[in-house]
Amino acid sequence: MVVYQLLATISFGDAVSNDTLALQEIIKKMGYKTAIFAENIDSRIPKGTAKNYSKLGRVDKNDIIIYHLSTGSKISRDFDKFKCRKIIIYHNITPPDYFKDYNDGSYRIYKKGYEEVKSLADKTDYCIAVSEYNKQNLREMGFTCPIDVLPILIPFEDYDKKPNEEVIRKYSDDGWVNVLFTGRIAPNKKQEDVIRAFAYYKKYYNPKSRLFLVGSSGGMERYHRRLISYINALGVRDVIFPGHIKFDEILAYYRVADVFLCQSEHEGFCVPLVEAMKFAVPIVAYDSSAIAGTLGGSGIL
């Protein structure tokens, strides 16, 4: 028996990819043969970690398919042909309308993804939802199979590694309040709402404050430009976009943060909330989607 994990894209530092890799280690420790196949493989992923989905050979009826579902994918369209035991881990799919004005490709793939999820309702044996919110989504889309909630697997030992000294040195112990949000620059994350709240705080409460919006804007350049225009229109200073950075730098930004401010409108889980809790950073968040479930009573909603 082989346990195959399938996903559309395995990326460096992505929550779905990290969950896949963490589960891979658990499966190996249990003594099972296992392999990861993805349609797209980030060049930064160590060679041999995953194989291209097109190279997936014959799957035996005694094997197990675990499909990490988070976007539109050929895997969804092929799913019915696998005659083995099948499990879907549902990470949720961002509503496509968020991307309509910013990236036509993203809009199409997320729209297709929603349609594909519904088509899989009667084609899987079992589902794992990474949040109660995701479980409710699956039920609403017609899934009647057993569904359990299992949060994303997070390798907490990685967060005990040494943070980037340059970031620590530059932004700590200077009397300024550091406001942080981490997550890709994307419309559903509502970075404009974070900026607006920060601008009010900086103007009326504490001029010695700065905002870090950590995350990649790849594919969302139009949205990023709109955020810059919004910052200029508000006349607010000290809004910093570090971009897609190294892991030790992410650790450092959590170390120097005084508060984590999340205004996201759609999250299937939201790993950064757990990261902020790991570093004991106070959290203020908008009560949407899976946010409250992930916080579990922590933070201010």
Positions of the model-derived regions?
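Glycosyltransferase donor-sugar binding loop
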Residues: 39-42, 210-225, 243
